[in-house]
């Protein structure tokens, strides 16, 4: 069933993540959109994804490595990665957490 609306607070999403015991948890799916909260511990081990991806930084600072580039980030920044592009977070602070939005068809738009 399609949702008419959905809301989360950062605290609610963080609590769900803590309960999961994982570095990420999927909070919502509808159509091609998937919303997650992601909080790696120590090292970011993610691999390229099949869909386009948007990050919105919740907390923390660090370096975003993507497509041969290195970009400093901090709370409130928005980062885009096309499907299939290797990327990772490095040198991130212990409080680092980000929203993740996957969307579109596999292979990207």
Model region roles, listed by residue range:
Residues 43-44, 79, 83-88:
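Histidine-centered metal-chelating micro-motifs
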Residues 35-37, 64, 98:
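Short hydrophobic/aromatic-rich beta-strand segments that constitute the beta-sheet cores
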Residues 84-109:
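Ligand-binding loop in jelly-roll beta-barrel domains
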Residues 1-37, 42-47:
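A short, N-terminal "cap"/entry segment at the start of jelly-roll beta-barrel domains
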Residues 68-83:
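Short acidic-glycine-tyrosine-enriched beta hairpin
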Residues 49-64:
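Short, conserved beta-strand element in jelly-roll/cupin
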Residues 29-31, 65-69, 92:
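Short strand-coil-strand connectors
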